[in-house]
Amino acid sequence: IPGESKGYAPSPEWKKATYGPNFEKQRDKAIAAIEAEYAKKLAEAEDEETRNKLEKEKKNKISAAEAEYQYNVRWYVDWQYFDTFNTAIGQGYNSYTPLQLANYVATIVNGGKRMQPYVVDKILDPVTGEVVYQNQPVVRNIVSVSPENLELIKEAMSKVTSGEGTAAALFLDMPEFSGGAKTGTAQIGSKNTELEDLTNGLFVAFAPYDDPQIAVAAVIEYGEHGSDTAGLVAKAVFKQYFGW
């Protein structure tokens, strides 16, 4: 799809690989400029005292360039606590496709098995109706999250669609529904930009609670609150899938 990327989940390794080389180039460029500047000045120095003074200036400037590099690495390359906090709430460098979000939810509620997505379930012979190809589920990996934490997240998602949850009202007319969800309001732009107040509506959900069969991810561009927009899409999917 034009404009779509494969998405990524931030990690210490990703951050270092993404931003580390840029700051290394900046440092090397700055030091090279200092070396070139003082090579000329030293060549034109008239006496030893002037050369010593220039060497000291050069050393200080190189030290300053190194210090600036270390500062940048500390905050923009090395993983910080705020990166963990941002990632935990879906902010920061997170970037996911709707399919990845749906698979994310499926992984949580199936006990931690990340499955290989596929589009075609089976192929039938158009004449005989015989199954000539049947896709088989493939487990990509088991996530390193304890069963207790997975169950805790699943339970928390169920509270979103019940009681005073942010999506409880969405399912009031659907007593058959038992599952869970997470509403989302994805900020498009940063503060003090034209896009500051624009948001996409997101909604991820699963059903039923005890034996999950389906996970859904819906995104409505400029949809603001997920429960008001994308949630309606997920609700329609559940109704169609379960025949409610």
Predicted segments, located by residue:
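Beta-lactam-recognizing serine transpeptidase/beta-lactamase-like catalytic domain environment
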Residues: 1-217
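Noncatalytic linker/hinge segments flanking ATPase motor cores
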Residues: 41-44, 219-224, 244
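A short, terminal or domain-edge coil/loop segment
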Residues: 55-57, 61, 225-232
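Short amphipathic alpha-helical face segments that pack within enzyme cores
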Residues: 97-103, 229-236
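Short, gly/Ser/Thr-rich active-site loops of penicillin-recognizing serine hydrolases
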Residues: 130-138, 233-244
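Short alpha-helix boundary/capping segments
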Residues: 145, 196, 222-230
